[in-house]
Amino acid sequence: MILIIYAHPYPHHSHANKQMLEQAGTLENVEIRSLYHLYPDFNIDVAAEQEALSRASLIVWQHPMQWYSVPPLLKLWMDKALTHGWAYGHGGTALHGKYLLWAVTTGGGENHFTIGSHPGFDVLSQPLQATALYCGLKWLPPFSMHCTFICDDDTLQAQARQYKQRLLAWQEVNHG
């Protein structure tokens, strides 16, 4: 099962993420957990989140890039759901062998996220990749959609279909 942990503080403003979720939602064995819908008060139900994580073979962290990082509720979700003794540390093997995909949207162009005058995705992904590895997750190459503020609808739809194809390809290879 694919579990998409979706974290967008203003989901009604994001055509890109909406289209990504619509495409992913057409696949079988996909569960989408919209954190800002589930937890508007930031009071995370750790047991429910860990139960959802337990059912998944592929975990996707889908969100917009905010100040070169994740939205605040996703960071809090990581702090609360990925607990010592469950996700890491002594006895913390619940996520071992599962896969993690970082699916991120940006308002800036792809060149804005290359090494040079701005940090590249390899640099920006390091905290997330380190978290994944620390929890025994297998890190997959990220999926990114750039220029989402200025893309026309056809471009966004094409990129959302690429996202769906990426998830479908993972399902076909991993039977999940």
Swiss-Prot record:
It catalyses: a quinone + NADH + H(+) = a quinol + NAD(+); a quinone + NADPH + H(+) = a quinol + NADP(+). GO terms for molecular function: electron transfer activity; FMN binding; NADH:ubiquinone reductase (non-electrogenic) activity; NADPH dehydrogenase (quinone) activity. Belongs to the NAD(P)H dehydrogenase (quinone) family. KefF subfamily. Its main location: membrane. Its cofactor is FMN. GO terms for biological process: positive regulation of potassium ion transmembrane transport; potassium ion transport. It is found in: Cell inner membrane. Its EC number is 1.6.5.2. FMN binds at residues 8, 14-17, 65-68, 105-108. It is an enzyme of class 1 (oxidoreductase). This is Glutathione-regulated potassium-efflux system ancillary protein KefF. InterPro entries: Flavodoxin_fold, Flavoprotein-like_sf, K_H_efflux_KefF, KefG/KefF. Regulatory subunit of a potassium efflux system that confers protection against electrophiles. Required for full activity of KefC. Shows redox enzymatic activity, but this enzymatic activity is not required for activation of KefC. Homodimer. Interacts with KefC. It comes from the Bacteria. The gene is kefF. One of its GO terms (cellular component) is plasma membrane. Keywords: Cell inner membrane, Cell membrane, Flavoprotein, FMN, Membrane, NAD, Oxidoreductase. It is a peripheral membrane protein. It comes from Salmonella gallinarum (strain 287/91 / NCTC 13346). PANTHER family: GLUTATHIONE-REGULATED POTASSIUM-EFFLUX SYSTEM ANCILLARY PROTEIN KEFF, GLUTATHIONE-REGULATED POTASSIUM-EFFLUX SYSTEM ANCILLARY PROTEIN KEFG.
